[in-house]
């Protein structure tokens, strides 16, 4: 689900969240965004 990478990808307060994005893409999602410092994958 959207939480595939929530515990595996750090989310900084500012900047581009590349670790989240990469983790989500590897998990088969379109990408990822950070919400309250947690990585959420786009379906």
From Swiss-Prot:
Keyword list, A-Z: Disulfide bond, Ion channel impairing toxin, Knottin, Neurotoxin, Potassium channel impairing toxin, Secreted, Toxin, Voltage-gated potassium channel impairing toxin
Disulfide bond keyword on record: yes
Pfam families per UniProt: Toxin_17
Expression across tissues: Expressed by the venom gland.
Disulfide bonds: 5-23, 11-34, 20-39, 24-41
Entry's Gene Ontology molecular function annotations: potassium channel inhibitor activity; toxin activity
Superkingdom as given in the UniProt entry: Eukaryota
PROSITE patterns for this protein: ERGTX
Keyword Secreted: yes
Entry's localization field: Secreted
GO cellular component: extracellular region
UniProt free text on domains: The presence of a 'disulfide through disulfide knot' structurally defines this protein as a knottin.
Similarity section: Belongs to the ergtoxin family. Gamma-KTx 3 subfamily.
Role, per record: Blocks Kv11/ERG potassium channels (tested in MMQ lactotroph cells that contain the three ERG channels: rKv11.1/KCNH2/ERG1, rKv11.2/KCNH6/ERG2 and rKv11.3/KCNH7/ERG3). This toxin can be used to distinguish slow deactivating components (ERGS) from fast deactivating components (ERGF) currents, since it specifically blocks ERGS.
Listed name of the protein: Potassium channel toxin gamma-KTx 3.1
Origin organism lineage: Eukaryota, Metazoa, Ecdysozoa, Arthropoda, Chelicerata
